[in-house]
Amino acid sequence: MSPRNSALERFRQHQKIPEKRWQRLAFPDVGLLLCWLALIVIGMVMVTSSSLSEAHVERLSTHHFAIRQGIFYVGSSIFAYIAFMLGTNFYREKAKFILGLAFLGLLLVYAPGIGVVVNGSRRWLNLGVINLQVGEFAKLAVFIFTAAYLQHHTQRLDHSWQPIIGLLAVTACFALMFYLQPDFGTMVVIVATVLGMLFLSGVSIWRLLLLGVLIAPAMVWVLISESYRLRRLTTFINPWEYQYDEGYQLVNSLISFGRGGLFGVGLGESVQKHQYLPEAHTDFIFSIIAEETGLVGALIVMAILMILVWRAFAIGYLADRMRKRFSSLLAYGIGLWLGLQSLINIGVTTGALPTKGLTLPLISYGGSSILMTSIALAILARIDAESRFIARLEGKI
């Protein structure tokens, strides 16, 4: 066995290689890192601008939310570094444990003194310094487990329904937990991403269509089972008819887009953020981006998010070429997750989709979302670094 093949085999078996860890990994994808940095800069600027009025109303310091957002970015960077250094084998081997931890967290939101209720939803755990939104952790946990599960059952996916049903049963358990919180947006993202990962793992399109036919009635029932969801559905079709009731938020979001025009009214000059548009610094921050930077600024943000998703799929493709199936599926899953969540958030703010409480990745204010998105991107960077290392040893790059 040649020295090159020997090193490659030891790497795949997660054995020690004489070089230091940082020396045996390739530098992560530059496009991924640049998009990551760009979204952080945009998020910092836009949260600073969009939160000024909210801070004043809540009698907080002018830059209260901006300072906290900066702390979230710094703290998340530390956890992202740790996530990067752990390596992909850690996530594959601990997938069940991570999934169990996420499910436990979803149960603890009902525990008195620990669970936090906000606007009637039980989504947060009180950890003292921060309220952790467990759903953000659960999304990543489900996708890590799905990648490990599909890798383990690779040979059976083409001819057996059993592994598919097993995965859907786990997904259904988490979907039920999100239904009870309630958090319909996260439920949609998880179910759609798992189905996407099944497709990318090689499950035939006919099986997926059959699953879609079976799942669709359940999703429709969830959508219409609660009166407030049904009102959201009817409101987004014609928000102006309900502009002083259920359509108030969407109408003011659309006004933001109208005021922004092509080039925007200028940074810090938004009118809608002054208590006209609820959640201006969180779920509806894209509306303020459109108002202050115009269509041009909104398209730039969308382009950065699209490039980020593209790089995730490119990383997954390279990992697949290097026969790293778990890494490949996880990269695809992260790409699907970030793409779907961005699409839904932008769709909601533009009136293309009913209102849902999903953040714009890395831009919206919120520690839990920033933390888990940063960890997910760090895992992507690790997947890319490992795949490039193997490709370099095999002489493929």
From Swiss-Prot:
List, in alphabetical order, the Gene Ontology terms for molecular function in this entry. lipid-linked peptidoglycan transporter activity; peptidoglycan glycosyltransferase activity
Annotated membrane-spanning segments are: 27-47, 70-90, 97-117, 127-147, 160-180, 186-206, 208-228, 295-315, 329-349, 360-380
Main subcellular location of this protein, as a coarse class: membrane
Matching InterPro entries, A to Z? Cell_cycle_FtsW-rel_CS, FtsW, FtsW/RodA
**In which pathway is this protein known to take part?**
Cell wall biogenesis; peptidoglycan biosynthesis
UniProt keyword list:
Cell cycle, Cell division, Cell inner membrane, Cell membrane, Cell shape, Cell wall biogenesis/degradation, Glycosyltransferase, Membrane, Peptidoglycan synthesis, Transferase, Transmembrane, Transmembrane helix
Q: Name one GO biological process term.
A: cell wall organization
Q: So what EC number does this one have?
A: 2.4.99.28
> What domain of life is recorded for the organism?
Bacteria
- Membrane topology, as annotated: Multi-pass membrane protein
- Compartment(s) of residence: Cell inner membrane
A Gene Ontology CC term for this entry?
cell division site
Enzyme category, top tier? transferase
Quote the protein name from its UniProt record. Answer: Probable peptidoglycan glycosyltransferase FtsW
**Species the sequence originates in:** Dichelobacter nodosus (strain VCS1703A)
